[in-house]
Amino acid sequence: MDNVQPKIKHRPFCFSVKGHVKMLRLALTVTSMTFFIIAQAPEPYIVITGFEVTVILFFILLYVLRLDRLMKWLFWPLLDIINSLVTTVFMLIVSVLALIPETTTLTVGGGVFALVTAVCCLADGALIYRKLLFNPSGPYQKKPVHEKKEVL
């Protein structure tokens, strides 16, 4: 008798929770960068947020085009988690530095959006980490060989 496995229907990245969090993260970072540009904030604020926008766009394109499935020689979820944590640290620093002097309203707005971006990046990293931990097809999958056999 044939043991046919049902095909798992692929859910597009844009409709997944991970996709929604990445899109929200991109929107918040672009908004923060726009506020910093309009307010003529110090250049490091604009450069850091601009760099984060390009990195987030890279990861979104990577997942939308499913290039992570083609390039298996890199462990993309680990890179994504590291990126989320580094982005969290940088955006926290930018937001604190933008909020302390309270120079203009737009700079404060950019700082607030950078702070919300940092929280969103932390949530993104936690979401990816949770998916890695509970991935049933990962290397730590429990196999029937490891189960105890009952002796009667």
Curated annotation (Swiss-Prot):
Domain MARVEL: 13-133
GO BP field: lymphocyte chemotaxis; macrophage chemotaxis; neutrophil chemotaxis; secretion by cell
Membrane-spanning intervals of the chain: 45-65, 81-101, 108-128
Signal peptide: none
Keywords for the protein's UniProt record, in alphabetical order: Chemotaxis, Cytokine, Membrane, Secreted, Transmembrane, Transmembrane helix
Domain of life: Eukaryota
Any one Gene Ontology cellular component term annotated for this protein: extracellular space
Regulation: Partly inhibited by interleukin 10.
PROSITE patterns hit by this protein: MARVEL
Gene Ontology MF annotations: chemokine activity
Physiological role: May play an important role in inflammation and regeneration of skeletal muscle. Essential for embryonic development.
Family recorded in the similarity comment: Belongs to the chemokine-like factor family.
Protein name (database record): Chemokine-like factor
Species in which this protein is naturally found: Homo sapiens
UniProt gene name: CKLF
